[in-house]
A protein has these predicted regions:
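Short, conserved beta-strand element in jelly-roll/cupin
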Residues: 52-56, 66-84, 121-123
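Short, charged/polar surface micro-motifs in flexible loops or helix N-caps
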Residues: 44-48, 56-60, 80, 124-127
Length: 147
C-alpha cells in the first residue's frame, strides 16, 4: 500500500488492483489470514474502519463473528458466494450490499468458481439520526475546480 497524496483535510492511499488484494496477509494471533487488509488507519479515518478481503473458491471467513458496537456494510465487488447472518444463509454476488448490526452472527463464503472480493466498512451503530440526511449535510461550494 502506498500513499498517493495527503494534506490537511485528506489522505489518499493506493492498495493496488483488485486482483492483487489476494497478496495481502493479516496476522491474527498465531495464524495469518491471506487476502485481507484493513485500511482505516492507513487513511487516518476518524469515524470508521474498512477492509478489503478476497476469498478463493471454496474458502470461507473461517469463523462466525459479531461486534460490540460496530455495524458493518459489506460490498461485494467481484465474484459470488453465500452470506450467513444468525443462521440465515442467502446468495450474494457482485453488486450485493449487506448491512449487519453489531449483534448479528456473521460469516461469508465463496462457493463460486472465481475469487470473491469484498469491501467491508465498520462504523459505530446508531450514530446517524433523522437529521443526518446526506443531501442536507453536504455543502455545495461556489469555488472553481482545479483540474
Amino acid at each position: 500500500m502506498n500513499t498517493i497524496k495527503e494534506g490537511q483535510n485528506f489522505k489518499a492511499v493506493d492498495f493496488g488492483s483488485i486482483e492483487k488484494l489476494i497478496d495481502y496477509e493479516l496476522p491474527m494471533g498465531p495464524d495469518v489470514l491471506k487476502g485481507k487488509v484493513f485500511g482505516g488507519q492507513a487513511v487516518c479515518a476518524t469515524g470508521s474502519e474498512f477492509s478489503f478481503q478476497t476469498l478463493v473458491p471454496g474458502q470461507d471467513g473461517g469463523f462466525l463473528h459479531s461486534h460490540k458496537t460496530h455495524e458493518e456494510l459489506y460490498f461485494i465487488l467481484r465474484g459470488e458466494g453465500e452470506y450467513q447472518v444468525d443462521g440465515e444463509v442467502f446468495p450474494i454476488r457482485e453488486g450485493s450490499v449487506i448491512r449487519v448490526c453489531p449483534d448479528g452472527k456473521r460469516c461469508i463464503r465463496n462457493n463460486g468458481t472465481e475469487n470473491l472480493t469484498m469491501l467491508c466498512i465498520q462504523y459505530k451503530a446508531n450514530t446517524f439520526g433523522a437529521d443526518d440526511n446526506p443531501m442536507t449535510d453536504g455543502n455545495i461550494l461556489q469555488e472553481p475546480l482545479n483540474w
